[in-house]
A protein has these predicted regions:
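Transmembrane helical segments that form the transport core of multi-pass membrane transport proteins
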Residues: 269-339
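The first (N-terminal) embedded transmembrane alpha-helix
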Residues: 61-80, 151, 278-287
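Non-transmembrane, extramembrane segments of multi-pass ion/lipid transporters
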Residues: 19-56, 112-137, 250-265, 323-346
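Transmembrane helix-bundle signature of multi-pass membrane transporters/permeases
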Residues: 66-67, 94-106, 138, 142, ...
Length: 447
């Protein structure tokens, strides 16, 4: 209380909340207004710089991880460009590509996020104990892989049919999805566990390095495995039999996950599987957005085909970084889940924006150089760089918004942000990233 009995006015501490002072200042003379608002206008920039300095280790680790992801995505892009013959032979295959890649990031990105949270809260330990955090998370991820792979094939075929996209049979899709998913998941799972253990031992920030690196590994590994799985399609009676076995395996895994005596794994399956089904729909729609343009644009401009996996990967990875960081901060009580983001959320979003600008510039330049080296057609250097940067920045802003509100909503509903946020953000950004890329193609006159 002040001497006159009034409550002291609370000091405004949020960055970016200086507009009220600006408005009040403008009511005074111009010179006085400038004097009273100059220090407030400079304040947000100072706070951003100070936050970057305090988080420089995290920023550095995140930049290295996303840069590695962007570089390795070129391998996935070249693989995709080399799959043009199989995409022509297996009608509608592109519908299955984003969801096959996305599920690896959804399942194992969420796995890394949960393990990262356990590291922050002091619960993580390297152990083979079946009741331990590590074992139960790995067990649930294996069940998710089998169950979602079967659902992927069914949903991809159903949605493609509803949208009038011509595809191969349902059994072909189920076999390709499950065989490709199991092969790639075995590799990604092993590398995810290794990355988690090394992050724990070396003191890395798993929230910053997990999502981009696991997404990159998933991209590089999944496409070759999917390509191998396509050779099991169209084999007469063999393919329907394999498809039936695949569906049975998926249903059995789901039933076991819902009824297992392993309490933690059972909770993970029950919480995550419905969200993963929503993620599957979003990823299939992302493939459906690109499929009609695959023949006209991607085959005409192979350079755009090369950049597609990296473009979608980076968008999902950036959103995953923010979602994972916010998930840990929500658990620790550092961030409040409310409609208006806390100041620290805006500061984390500024890190995301800087990473996005840097990495999209890197991947667009690297793809253009690779296209020139390999004599792959592109719509012109400036146009290509412009459309990738425009689409990437647009997607980064969307990823920041989705990442925050998905984490806040799942937390307010008393769900685990690590289980729900990562899949929703990654798959949502696959769809929205594809839309942003198509929009960029239209704006720059390529589509």
């Amino acid at each position: 209380m002040t001497l006159d009995g009034k409550k002291p006015r609370a000091r405004r501490t949020l960055p970016f909340s200086f507009f009220g002072r600006v408005k009040a200042g403008l009511k005074q003379s111009p010179g006085l207004a400038a004097k009273r608002t100059a220090h407030r206008v400079a304040d947000p920039a100072r706070q951003v710089v100070d936050y970057f300095v305090s988080e420089r280790r995290t920023v550095r680790q995140g930049f290295v991880a996303v840069s590695v992801a962007a570089t390795t995505s070129l391998i996935a892009g070249l693989t995709l460009a080399g799959m043009s013959g199989r995409m022509e032979a297996i009608r509608g295959l592109f519908v299955l590509i984003p969801v096959s890649i996305g599920m690896r990031g959804n399942i194992f990105g969420a796995l890394a996020a949960r393990l990262g949270t356990s590291v922050h809260t002091g619960l993580f330990e390297v152990s083979r104990d079946k009741q331990g955090i590590l074992y139960q998370n790995v067990y649930a991820a294996a069940l998710h892989t089998l169950a979602t792979s079967a659902v992927m094939g069914v949903m991809a075929r159903a949605i493609a049919g509803l949208l009038g996209i011509r595809t191969v049979s349902l059994w072909d899709f189920v076999v390709i999805a499950l065989v490709g998913g199991v092969l790639s998941s075995a590799i990604v799972l092993a590398l995810t566990v290794y990355l988690s253990v090394e992050s724990f031992r070396r003191g890395w920030d798993l929230d910053s390095v997990g999502a981009p690196l696991i997404t990159a590994i998933g991209d590089v590994v999944t496409l070759p495995c999917l390509l191998l799985a396509t050779y099991l399609a169209g084999l007469g009676l063999v393919t329907p039999i394999l498809g039936g076995v695949a569906l049975a395996a998926g249903c059995a895994s789901l039933a076991h996950g819902y009824t297992t005596g392993n309490t933690f794994a059972r909770r993970l399956v029950r919480e995550s599987f419905p969200v993963l089904c929503v993620a599957i729909v979003l990823d299939v729609l992302a493939g459906a957005v690109v499929q009609p343009r695959a023949d006209d644009i991607l085959h005409k401009w192979p350079a755009i085909t090369i950049v597609v996996p990296g473009f979608l990967e980076i968008t999902g990875a950036l959103g995953g970084i923010l979602a994972a960081r916010l998930g840990s901060k929500l658990h620790l009580g550092v961030v409040s889940a409310r409609a208006r983001p806390d100041a620290i959320v805006l500061l984390d979003a500024s890190i995301l924006l800087v990473l996005g600008v840097t990495v999209y510039a890197l991947i667009s330049s690297a793809t253009l150089a690779l296209a020139e080296l390999l004599n792959q057609a592109h719509p012109g250097a400036l146009r290509f760089l412009g459309l990738v940067m425009f689409g990437g920045l647009l997607a980064t802003v969307v990823a920041a918004v989705i990442g925050y509100y998905a984490a806040a909503a799942t937390y307010r509903l008393h769900l685990d942000p690590d289980n729900q946020t990562i899949p929703l953000v990654t798959s949502g950004m696959d769809l929205l990233g594809a839309i942003c890329l198509v929009l960029a193609l239209v704006v720059f006159g390529v589509a």
